[in-house]
């Protein structure tokens, strides 16, 4: 009876170790934009394996792909670093689980300072983005500052970008009055 039990145990061990699952690697942490939708995460596919995904923190919601090697996630609006926000455990054909693979996710929520309205001759105003370190672009933007005289009269959309994320602000430059010369009666 002991021999039969040992044979069964040995068979299970051989099947599990013979169909080993292997850990995957990725860049950690991952950076996503606040309110991003359809963000795809995947591991190398082993055709006979199944995959159990868990998404926690960052307002993340697993949308599609549970059980497969690829999922899509919609992220929330609250910025911050979320340790172990995405986890996957691969199980082989013998239903033996592999090592959990964990991914930290940094949700990046950009904002820009509201400025203006301006008059056509107003001085240059620095543009401030949060978090710092991004780049401002748009009509009238020079070296992360807005120059009303360069932009001219009009309505403008300025964009702040960092790590693939963007936010915009609207800026208005108004025409100043045109006053005629001083005259004497």
Q: In which residue ranges do the predicted regions lie?
A:
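Bacterial Sec-dependent N-terminal signal peptides
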Residues: 1-26
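Proline- and Ser/Thr-rich low-complexity, intrinsically disordered segments
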Residues: 23-49, 54-185
